[in-house]
């Protein structure tokens, strides 16, 4: 545990991640819950009990007893059954030891001062914690067992304690505890953290952006863990056609259950995807459960993506390993299906980079080849196509994507056109255009939905043969 990325590997993320919300939901580390707001003692008393009607295991709490650290206050807290740990945390006395050992010292002093104190008259169940602190070691062991085999550097600890216990503890501590006494939840979290650090000294407890989130139910002693995903940024080249960017569920069974005959039980319309060609080697290397793929746009299944590649962020879920060298991962990915997909520029990143990649709109360069019947003179074709350079297109939502795109007219600029080549009935050219341009429709017009188009300027029906993304102009 703790064999993780160095501090230089990842910069601290200040936004774009929702883990910090736990800090306001009583799931922070000890530092996040040590701040005790001033309380009106009279209001606190009136909230939940009615003076002398409150009893604790037959031992009436004397609400008129002085608060700690007065000797009579400490003696009274002992009489009502405070355990050594709670005695120390609300006693307000400095000792050489803390926790149970510190409380035992205070108890010993109190018994030496007051011979009337008797262990036999003291309740066995602590009214301040219901003996929760006896389970600290057990809880720490459960956390370690649950996370066995998982490498992590930081942890966020969340504690759930029954409301009625918190209320009763707060009333007793507010009335009889020393000023500034730490509340139960803070002290319980601190005790668990101290025990964890005693067993695993190379981890840090944090209030936000942890590698691992742990929640403890104080009622059942149940421990739940949530391993935070890791994110890796890079660019991919798709060298073969017929591969979707992400997993495509089977059209017949929608990927439900064990699939169907149509997908041969895979649940997928296409057996391969850029997501899995890249993600499977990473998932296996990090011993993770699954991946999610976030690309800067996407190309059609029959379109290649060349040049420096398309930026993407791969999200790796529930990784047991978090410190793999990106260069090593890059090598594993590129040896997986080198004739189909390659990656470059891999580096670890943060969750905020997902939205940055998905929201970035970059100009793109393409090369497209199409076929026409009865072509006009070559010079006329070249001049007509070059004449579209700088034009702003009006593109209605294409028929082929109308099921997943809003019906509206989009304006997109053709930045430049170059390298027009005419080879009998086949024509090829390169262009650079605004993000979101439907390039195939620029050529064949989609039955007039794109204006102007190559079809309209050469007055011939156009059949697109292939399209390649040559470059995505993103920093």
Spans of features found by a protein language model:
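Short, Lys/Arg-enriched N-terminal segments with co-localized hydrophobic residues
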Residues: 1-4
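Non-catalytic RNA-recognition surface used by pseudouridine synthases
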Residues: 6-475
């Amino acid at each position: 545990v703790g064999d993780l990325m160095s501090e230089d590997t990842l910069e601290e993320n200040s936004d774009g991640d929702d883990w910090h919300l736990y800090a306001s939901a009583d799931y922070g580390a000890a530092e996040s819950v040590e701040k005790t707001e001033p309380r009106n003692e009279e209001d606190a008393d009136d909230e939940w009990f009615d003076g002398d009607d409150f009893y604790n295991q037959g031992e009436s709490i004397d609400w008129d007893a002085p608060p700690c650290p007065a000797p009579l206050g400490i003696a009274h807290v002992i009489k009502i059954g405070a355990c050594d740990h709670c005695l120390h945390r609300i006693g307000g006395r400095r000792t050489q030891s803390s926790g149970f050992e510190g409380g035992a010292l205070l108890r010993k002093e109190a018994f030496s001062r007051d011979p009337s104190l008797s262990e036999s008259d003291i309740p066995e169940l602590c009214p301040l914690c219901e003996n929760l602190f006896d389970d600290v070691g057990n809880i720490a062991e459960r956390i370690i067992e649950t996370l066995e085999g998982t490498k992590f550097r930081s942890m966020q600890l969340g504690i759930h304690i029954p409301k009625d216990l918190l209320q009763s503890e707060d009333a007793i501590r507010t009335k009889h505890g020393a000023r500034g006494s730490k509340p139960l939840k803070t002290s319980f979290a601190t005790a668990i953290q101290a025990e964890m650090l005693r067993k695993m000294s190379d981890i840090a407890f944090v209030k936000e952006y942890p590698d691992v989130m742990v929640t403890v139910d104080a009622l059942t002693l149940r421990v739940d863990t949530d391993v935070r995903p890791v994110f890796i940024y890079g660019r991919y080249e798709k060298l073969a056609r017929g591969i979707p960017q992400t997993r495509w569920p089977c059209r017949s069974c929608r990927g439900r259950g064990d699939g169907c005959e149509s997908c041969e039980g895979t649940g997928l319309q296409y057996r391969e995807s850029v997501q899995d060609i890249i993600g499977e080697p990473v998932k296996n290397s990090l011993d993770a459960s699954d991946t999610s793929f976030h690309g800067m746009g996407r190309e059609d299944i029959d379109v290649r993506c060349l040049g420096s590649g398309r930026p993407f962020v791969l999200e790796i879920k529930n990784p047991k390993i978090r410190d793999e060298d990106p260069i090593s991962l890059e090598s594993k990915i590129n040896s997986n299906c080198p004739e189909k997909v390659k990656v470059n520029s891999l580096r670890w990143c943060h969750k905020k980079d997902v939205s940055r990649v998905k929201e970035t709109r970059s100009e793109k360069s393409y090369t497209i080849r199409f076929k026409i019947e009865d072509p006009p003179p070559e010079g006329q074709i070249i001049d007509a196509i070059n004449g579209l350079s700088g034009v702003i297109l009006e593109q209605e939502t294409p028929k082929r994507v109308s099921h997943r795109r809003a019906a509206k007219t989009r304006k997109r600029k053709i930045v430049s056109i170059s390298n027009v080549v005419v080879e009998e009935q086949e024509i090829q050219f390169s262009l650079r255009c605004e993000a979101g341009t439907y390039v195939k429709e620029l050529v064949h017009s989609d039955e007039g939905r794109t204006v102007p188009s190559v079809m309209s300027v050469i007055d011939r029906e156009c059949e697109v043969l292939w399209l390649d993304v040559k470059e995505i102009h993103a920093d």
